[in-house]
């Protein structure tokens, strides 16, 4: 899609075929787009017209992944495996090609939720902002496992485990741009936990400073609801999350000094099962991927009135899972 940032609208430009493209990530240099596919991971480049062409793909020696991220230097691609509980690291090359697998680790342990088969389900992998560690959020066993990426031995080394409440279902972790705070979204308990992060010691330190519900309703633990998406505004002053089931988006004001969150609104999103959301670069417009209703919906955010206003009709698209903004480089 072409993005009209000023008006907050999307116009379809082109498409490329990928088998089960459940998640995407843009390379650190902004030149390439990585995508999950059934066979592993694929990488694409964009021409001057915005069309995508495949560079290559790699097999990850496991079941289809569900989440992608890159390290701070752009040398590695990290893959989360929900179905097999695996964390995979793939080498990347300057010319865009995906290289060999650096390492892969299968999580072990028993979870507390029967619907998840009591098994590990890695839902998100993201490096710490200081690039010292890799956080693997395991939705099945209620843990965030923290690894050191040993570049000399080409190994993932487990250094710590952040244990979450039973049956909370951690889903996504995001860090503030200054690297001082981490926010974890919990799918089953429908809450966000804020942590102070300090990577200066021998092991990383995560200090819990706040727990806040994703929904404004009294019965936040309604089993029909599932916290699903988490996004920080580009200026770092607000945090947004979605809750499937009740199908809402919530906005929180973020204190940049303390990292604490204050709810500003929880509003309906005119779609079903909002799996992902993203702010446009101006932070004035919000785009949501509504998986069950097969739509994208766009909104203008009014920060003074604490409301969102829908921009036009929903855009039809089959079972959207992930949205990424890919800026066009300035010539």
Question: Which residues are covered by each model-predicted region?
Answer:
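Short loop/turn segments immediately following the C-termini of beta-strands
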Residues: 38, 82, 92, 139-140, ...
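Blade-loop segments of beta-propeller domains
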Residues: 12-74
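Blade-level signature of beta-propeller repeat domains, shared across WD40, Kelch, NHL, RCC1
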Residues: 291-300, 309-331
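Asp-box/WD-like beta-propeller blade repeats and closely related beta-sheet repeat scaffolds
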Residues: 53-124
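A short beta-strand motif characteristic of beta-propeller blades
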Residues: 11-17, 53-59, 109-115, 157-163, ...
